[in-house]
Amino acid sequence: DHKRVLEGDKGANTGGMGAYSPSRLINPVLEEKILNKIIKPTINALKEMGSNYKGFLYAGLMIIDSEPYLIEYNVRMGDPECQTILPKLKTDLLEIIQACCRGKLENLEIEWYDKKSLCVVLCSKGYPERYDNEVLIENAEKFNLDENDFIYHAGTKKIGNKIYSNGGRVINFVSLSSNFKESRDKIFNHINKLDWSGGFFRKDIGYKVIDE
């Protein structure tokens, strides 16, 4: 994901201004290194400790000279990584969670859509510092989305029939496509339909994988 608030990956750190999947860095060789160097040893250590942990295990990695290094673990999904990845999931998420809880994941074939996914986060002006809440967002419910487009409310609240901002990161726009540029263009088209003077977003999410 893109952590910095400003375009070009500059400015203050945030919870995440957007993300894309798949990563430009991943390949079969690196994936094997991550599994053998980090994931499998972690799972084996949990077993040795007698831990019966079942759930998400989110590894925050840094790749240096094609070698993976573990920065942190979280027992949750990332935000906005979750919004970016889950729309690519063809298998019902509930089936996966149930199989995990019952210890039967090895019997479940998890399938994914072969598409690119891009997420752009619309934020309150001033984020990640001071910002105003309860700023009216016009047209927030007037989208005609196709099956590959998704809108996730985060820092919003509904008063009557109107939607207002209620946090720093406010709305996530996600689009699946055969290429990242098409996903980005569809997202921009949706954002431009909003009437919200109190918001901003990074226009360069995915710039490292989008060939203009």
PLM features per residue range, with description:
Residues 1-2, 59-63, 68-77, 155:
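Short beta-strand elements
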Residues 1-38, 75-88:
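ATP-dependent carboxylate/phosphate-activation module, predominantly the ATP-grasp catalytic core
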Residues 6-8, 107-109, 156-163:
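Short beta-strand/turn micro-motifs at beta-sheet edges
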Residues 32-57, 74-146, 159:
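Active-site "cap" helix and flanking loop/linker of ATP-utilizing ligase/carboxylase catalytic domains
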Residues 51-65, 203:
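A short glycine-rich, hydrophobically flanked beta-strand micro-motif that places a catalytic Asp/Glu
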Residues 58-60, 69-70, 119-121, 172:
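Structured core elements
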Residues 156-160, 164-212:
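Generic C-terminus detector
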